[in-house]
Amino acid sequence: MDLDQWISKVKDGQHLSEDELQLLCEYVKEILIEESNVQPVNSPVTVCGDIHGQFHDLMKLFQTGGHVPETNYIFMGDFVDRGYNSLEVFTILLLLKARHPANITLLRGNHESRQLTQVYGFYDECQRKYGNANAWRYCTDVFDYLTLSAIIDGTVLCVHGGLSPDVRTIDQIRLIERNCEIPHEGPFCDLMWSDPEDIETWAVSPRGAGWLFGSRVTTEFNHINNLDLVCRAHQLVQEGLKYMFQDKGLVTVWSAPNYCYRCGNVASILSFNDNMEREVKFFTETEENNQMRGPRTGVPYFL
């Protein structure tokens, strides 16, 4: 595998061959299987939210935050679906993981799922670009190996969605069997699907999966686990980044600018330096994505 050549190829807008993609997926699975459900990461590191197939904007993200391996990254899932270039997004992230495994951490999001990708675009995109479903199969097999969360210097937990009534301690996340399709309920599901809300404890989620969780729940979780902050993605934020609750114990990071080529939002990434001091960097859509505006199917954004 000539990873550097493949990286250049994908950045130039070409696809790997089906055989090359299969080789890459198998290689990355061997790296991911060694990672913990709560993968320890050292600062300095930059945390990113949903990308959703917006490849040109991902390239702008790297221009904004720095390139791997000079900058370390945690991507909090939802690499695919909705945008037109899910294949390129996931391929380049896998290539960077293969080339610099210690410098990039890839978390699973609710869209890293066979079920959702058959509805929201990734399956159809693979069919269109390869002429069959093999590429989709190779990629969705990798989904099952992606880790569930990361913890920065023991004090900041990164997870795609949010908290679970079944998870009081970080150790309980470590015990989850993750090598499977995302279940429809339970702690694994909740970590992928839950959302913070201006309530005290728990409420039913309008998404039909996960929970709404409130300020008291978040404060208690952070206290029990000696955390300063929970970082998560999963929800569009017009201003790119949003702290929740009076103690600002949780932050939503959103990294897909002008989401779905029509939402008009800015994107952000959240950097932690060696002293865990935070810096937010904002960016807007690229010209390439600007040209992609057009009629979109009426799929609710919050899934």
Swiss-Prot record:
Disruption phenotype: No visible phenotype under normal growth conditions, but the double mutant plants fypp1 and fypp3 exhibit severe developmental defects in roots and leaves, and show defective gravitropism. Zn(2+) 1 binds at residues 50, 52, 78. Its main location: cytoplasm. SUPFAM superfamilies: Metallo-dependent phosphatases. Its EC number is 3.1.3.16. It catalyses: O-phospho-L-seryl-[protein] + H2O = L-seryl-[protein] + phosphate; O-phospho-L-threonyl-[protein] + H2O = L-threonyl-[protein] + phosphate. It holds the Pfam family Metallophos. Its cofactor is Zn(2+). Binds 2 zinc ions per subunit. CDD domains: MPP_PP2A_PP4_PP6 (cd07415). The record marks 81 as: Required for catalytic activity. Keywords: Cytoplasm, Hydrolase, Manganese, Metal-binding, Protein phosphatase, Zinc. Mostly expressed in flowers. Also detected to a lower extent in stems and leaves. Expressed in roots. GO terms for molecular function: protein serine/threonine phosphatase activity; zinc ion binding. One of its GO terms (cellular component) is cytoplasm. Zn(2+) 2 binds at residues 78, 110, 160, 234. It is found in: Cytoplasm. The active site is at 111 (proton donor). The keyword Ribonucleoprotein does not apply. InterPro entries: Calcineurin-like_PHP_ApaH (IPR004843), Metallo-depent_PP-like (IPR029052), PPA2-like (IPR047129), Ser/Thr-sp_prot-phosphatase (IPR006186). Catalytic subunit of protein phosphatase 6 (PP6). Dephosphorylates phosphorylated phytochromes, with a preference toward Pfr forms. Plays a major role in the photoperiodic control of flowering time in long days by modulating phytochrome signals in flowering time control. Involved in the regulation of polar auxin transport in roots. Dephosphorylates directly the auxin efflux carriers PIN1 and PIN2, thus promoting their proper polar localization in root cell plasma membrane. Belongs to the PPP phosphatase family. PP-6 (PP-V) subfamily. Interacts with PHYA and PHYB, mostly when they are phosphorylated and in Pfr forms. Interacts with TAP46. Interacts with PIN1 and PIN2. Interacts with ABI5. Interacts with PIF3 and PIF4. Protein phosphatase 6 (PP6) holoenzyme is a heterotrimeric complex formed by the catalytic subunit FYPP, a SAPS domain-containing subunit (SAL) and a protein phosphatase 2A regulatory subunit A (PP2AA). This is Phytochrome-associated serine/threonine-protein phosphatase 1. The gene is FYPP1.
